[in-house]
């Protein structure tokens, strides 16, 4: 069985303390993961602090270069993740284009290359996002929840930028149910991850996540002889398979809101 871990970096604390702890953890267990990075104002910054460059994640660019040197994969997250989380689902094309352009240009200025992938904050999407991802020539995107790689269709927009969905319930959702104690969350996640899926299981965490919980998951997966893959490796394998088009819908995530989700396959519409 295969497992993929991705990390989304959206806060100043995540870009500093959180990343340092996770990088040390992944190094100790010799695991390569995919980091999706925002370069705009941190979600943990208040309104006035968001206006100053020191509270933008770009101010901590050195740690992002350390990620690359450690052999991990880098992908892009929205520039203003707070705005994206609250507005993207109902935004028009112009708003989405402005947000996309700002994220893209910030990425190009820092890394001198185009991003290879993108992940949407809180699984909030709209049709225009899929259009811009295809236009940018991304190798893949990971914006939604789901079960298998697919080409997204939303309203009148069809994209051939493959989606690699997150398959395991986000920790924010599990916590919102109030059904699990923090000390047993890893047991629930591990049980869920036992289901065999075409491209394996994909777990996304925040850079602020408790490293003790992350280590418990790694130890349990290692103990069950899991193979750890990065998202680019999953995308490469998916490219050799028959990828279908699926509609993208919405699913209510307990008290954690609504998340974009892989829905029905489009009849007889494959790559």
Regions inferred by a protein language model and the residue ranges of each:
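Catalytic alpha-helical scaffold of carbohydrate-active enzymes acting on polysaccharides/glycoconjugates
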Residues: 1-117, 122-162, 181-199, 207-271
